[in-house]
């Protein structure tokens, strides 16, 4: 075993600089918090807990802008996951997490453990996970390494979720060269619980037991939290040891054991928390801090699968499928019997103490004795300097880009073959979307929808993020992300309830990057306030750059909504011929950052038009009322590719075409003005629908035949649905074939 440095050697050689702890922070810990030099183990604990991934020291100042309260919110940010009341004593529990850095270096395990970690966050609240979603952003598919990364990532997501018996019901997948060296992998999990069973990550009550349950501890993932708080260079393949290894079968056992405990014997329990980033130190210190308690742990008692592990390694290991419990004194054996039944370790490794110190013993020696709050609450915040990106200033001085479309049919077909637009079926078929048979709507539609068993209710869920728009204007782009998510929820006939987020950005020490972070949060916060969708959980992933080149700022918004009656669930496919087609929302010249701009120019540039959030909220509510009255046959949110893509996708489900005649130009057919919907309405409800939506809906045609017959202001086209669908379905399989 390697000889650890002495406190004096640490001060002299500064190994903490490689663990994302700055010299200023180290000196502050020595001089202000401990009044002595920390030893090797203590220094490692501070480095992990003070990393951006655990502490949000860079981003905390802007995260405070988020609205987090509302009449349905039972638990906001700060716990394992957010909890939202859906009535009848039930709640929906959800959270999203990023696993970008691990996925970049070991994509299968990086993605798999991303799913595993977010599932544990949900069942640590006492909820049974019922669904997962993802948000994936990769480089262009002409690169062999990118194709490998994508295949392995999808396999990792599917492999873990399928083994757990939890359906993957939705998500998004986009492609842009900016993500080539640093893909974005965000996972979201949704669970359901009876409100009476809700748990918290809390440790208090002198003498109560700290119990370690689940898999044994190994050396995988050590310093994973600090790894996620660093930028990449082109040699990041060497960092695979920081990636955890998952075992979904072990997690399935852990899930069932934990739910048996929380649902049948909650009176034995004080608190429960997942061992995620920074492993034992994070879960234990956070639980003690939340309980305003002290804690003493004996690391010799921690179940270990490798010999000779140091205290440093035991505390910072991020081995998967582990939970930490605070159990009332006298019930330790009762809890152990539950976990014994599932053949899982369940060991008392410490006790709650009366003081406020965090004490660790290893091989009979005290290897850590520090105030609990020094790890969790005394972190030095580091807001960065800010500067508006120069490209925004330059673009604002230029005339807006106007596309020229000379051949509508050709452009339409090219659009459907774009990787971001094309069918993702070859990837989503990897996922089991129907396991446990609660899935009503699976991948490929605006929202995934699951029934709430024993009721007529459903839960709609979606993930949305478009880095191009955030890059062009972070604040407006942030608003658009929330509006897009709300549009997906509304299109299913659901009421938007709340959001979770993953904030994926570059190096926050760059003033332009921090400006993007700050202003995107401003935009998301504003939209959440207006649309009444508070932020209940989330995650920040910074330092997403390779060799100094940042990804697009890519916040992901995960939204959950309530379908009050599944009889009025709305799908995105045209249902019958002869229904009237309406375009809801006004169409503007919104081409900056659009799929059309990328396709025709190969670049992204320009300025975004702002949104009237109050107006959008108003007609969204009127549209939802029409859906709940049973007046809407189908609805599809308009996003990438605009009305053109939504028309095509709505026709693919049942092969029903449309005859469209409207005042839009060929270019406007591809405009990406946010907040719009394509709605089909049975003729008997058409007049009532038109009256309710008034000037916010215009009739553009009818469903009919087996082709899209378009008569626009400047061009016309007759496009067979079968031909369009073939292009759309075959594009990605063709691109994924080796070109080497």
Curated annotation (Swiss-Prot):
The reaction(s) this protein catalyses: N(2)-formyl-N(1)-(5-phospho-beta-D-ribosyl)glycinamide + L-glutamine + ATP + H2O = 2-formamido-N(1)-(5-O-phospho-beta-D-ribosyl)acetamidine + L-glutamate + ADP + phosphate + H(+)
CDD domains in alphabetical order: PurL_repeat1 (cd02203), PurL_repeat2 (cd02204)
Classification via NCBIfam families: FGAM_synth_II, PRK01213.1
Protein's organism: Lactobacillus delbrueckii subsp. bulgaricus (strain ATCC 11842 / DSM 20081 / BCRC 10696 / JCM 1002 / NBRC 13953 / NCIMB 11778 / NCTC 12712 / WDCM 00102 / Lb 14)
Cell location: Cytoplasm
Binding site for Mg(2+) 1: 97, 539
GO biological process terms held by the UniProt record: 'de novo' IMP biosynthetic process
Residues annotated as binding ATP: 56, 95, 501, 538
Signal peptide span: none
Molecular-function GO term, any one: phosphoribosylformylglycinamidine synthase activity
Keywords attached to this entry: ATP-binding, Cytoplasm, Ligase, Magnesium, Metal-binding, Nucleotide-binding, Purine biosynthesis
Biological role: Part of the phosphoribosylformylglycinamidine synthase complex involved in the purines biosynthetic pathway. Catalyzes the ATP-dependent conversion of formylglycinamide ribonucleotide (FGAR) and glutamine to yield formylglycinamidine ribonucleotide (FGAM) and glutamate. The FGAM synthase complex is composed of three subunits. PurQ produces an ammonia molecule by converting glutamine to glutamate. PurL transfers the ammonia molecule to FGAR to form FGAM in an ATP-dependent manner.
Stored InterPro entries: PRibForGlyAmidine_synth_PurL, PurL_linker, PurM-like_C_dom, PurM-like_C_sf, PurM-like_N, PurM-like_N_sf
Upper taxonomic lineage: Bacteria, Bacillati, Bacillota, Bacilli, Lactobacillales
Residue numbers binding substrate: 98-101, 120, 244, 318-320, 541
Residues binding Mg(2+) 2, per UniProt: 121, 274
Membrane-spanning residues: none
Pathway linked to the protein: Purine metabolism; IMP biosynthesis via de novo pathway; 5-amino-1-(5-phospho-D-ribosyl)imidazole from N(2)-formyl-N(1)-(5-phospho-D-ribosyl)glycinamide: step 1/2
Active-site annotation: 53, 99 (proton acceptor)
Record's GO cellular component terms: cytoplasm
Pfam families (alphabetical): AIRS, AIRS_C, FGAR-AT_linker
This protein's name: Phosphoribosylformylglycinamidine synthase subunit PurL
């Amino acid at each position: 075993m390697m000889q650890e440095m002495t406190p004096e050697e640490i001060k002299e050689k500064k190994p903490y600089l490689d663990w994302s702890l700055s010299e200023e922070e180290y000196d502050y810990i020595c001089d202000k918090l401990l009044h002595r030099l920390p030893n090797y183990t203590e220094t490692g604990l501070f480095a992990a807990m003070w990393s951006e991934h655990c502490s949000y020291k860079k981003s905390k100042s802007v995260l405070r802008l988020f609205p987090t309260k509302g009449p349905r919110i039972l638990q906001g940010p700060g716990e394992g996951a957010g909890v939202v009341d859906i009535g009848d004593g039930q709640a929906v529990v959800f959270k999203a997490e990023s696993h970008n850095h691990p996925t970049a270096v070991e994509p299968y395990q990086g993605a798999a453990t991303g799913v595993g970690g977010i599932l544990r966050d949900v069942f640590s609240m006492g909820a049974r996970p019922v669904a997962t979603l993802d948000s994936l952003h990769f480089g262009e598919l002409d690169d062999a390494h990118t194709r490998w990364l994508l295949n392995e990532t999808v396999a990792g997501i599917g492999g873990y979720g399928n083994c757990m018996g939890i359906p993957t019901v939705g998500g998004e997948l986009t492609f842009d060269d900016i993500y080539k060296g640093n893909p974005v992998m965000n996972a979201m999990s949704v669970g359901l619980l009876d409100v009476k069973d809700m748990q918290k990550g809390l440790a208090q009550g002198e003498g109560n037991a700290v119990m370690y349950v689940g898999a044994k501890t190994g050396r995988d993932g050590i310093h994973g939290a600090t790894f996620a708080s660093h930028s990449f260079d082109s040699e990041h393949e060497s960092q695979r040891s920081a990636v955890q290894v998952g075992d979904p079968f072990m997690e399935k056992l852990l899930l069932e054991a934990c739910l048996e405990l929380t649902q049948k014997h909650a009176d034995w329990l004080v608190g429960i928390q997942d061992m995620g980033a920074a492993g034992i130190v994070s879960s234990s210190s956070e639980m003690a801090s939340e309980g305003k308690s002290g804690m003493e742990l004996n690391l010799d008692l921690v179940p270990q699968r490798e010999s000779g592990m140091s205290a440093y390694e035991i505390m910072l290991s991020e081995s998967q499928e582990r939970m930490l419990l605070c159990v009332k004194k006298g019930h330790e054996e009762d809890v152990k019997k539950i976990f014994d039944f599932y053949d899982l370790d369940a060991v008392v490794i410490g006790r709650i103490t009366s003081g406020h110190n965090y004490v660790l013993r290893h091989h009979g020696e005290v290897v850590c004795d520090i105030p609990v709050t020094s790890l969790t609450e005394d972190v030095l915040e580091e807001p960065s300097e800010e500067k508006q990106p120069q490209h925004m200033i330059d673009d604002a001085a230029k005339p807006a880009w106007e596309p020229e479309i000379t051949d509508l049919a050709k452009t339409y077909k090219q659009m459907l073959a774009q990787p971001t637009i094309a069918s993702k079926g070859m990837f989503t078929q990897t996922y089991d979307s129907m396991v446990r048979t609660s899935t009503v709507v699976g991948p490929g539609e605006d929202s995934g929808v699951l029934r709430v068993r024993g009721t007529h209710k459903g839960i709609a869920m979606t993930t949305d993020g478009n880095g191009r728009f955030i890059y062009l204007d972070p604040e407006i782009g942030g608003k658009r992300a929330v509006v897009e998510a709300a549009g997906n929820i509304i299109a299913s006939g659901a009421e938007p309830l709340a959001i979770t987020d993953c904030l994926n950005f570059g190096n926050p020490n760059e003033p332009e990057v921090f400006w993007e972070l700050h202003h995107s949060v401003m935009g998301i916060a504003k939209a959440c306030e207006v649309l009444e969708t508070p932020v209940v959980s989330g995650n920040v992933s910074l330092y997403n750059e390779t060799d100094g080149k940042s990804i697009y700022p890519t916040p992901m918004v995960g939204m959950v909504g309530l379908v009050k009656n599944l009889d009025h669930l709305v799908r995105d496919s045209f249902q019958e011929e002869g229904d009237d087609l309406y375009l809801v929302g006004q169409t503007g010249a919104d081409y900056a950052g659009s799929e059309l701009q990328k396709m025709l120019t190969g670049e992204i540039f320009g300025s975004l038009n702002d949104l009237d959030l109050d107006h959008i909220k108003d007609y969204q509510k009127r549209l939802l009322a029409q859906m709940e009255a049973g007046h809407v046959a189908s609805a599809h949110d308009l996003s990438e590719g605009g009305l053109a893509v939504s028309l095509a996708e709505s026709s693919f489900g049942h092969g029903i075409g449309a005859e469209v005649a409207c005042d839009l130009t060929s270019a406007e057919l591809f405009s990406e003005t946010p907040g719009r919907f394509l709605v089909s309405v049975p003729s008997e409800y058409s007049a009532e629908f038109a009256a309710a939506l008034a000037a916010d809906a215009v009739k553009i045609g009818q469903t009919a035949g087996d082709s899209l017959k378009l008569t626009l202001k400047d061009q016309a086209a007759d496009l067979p649905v079968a031909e369009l669908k073939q292009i759309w379905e075959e594009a990605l399989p063709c691109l994924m074939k080796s070109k080497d």
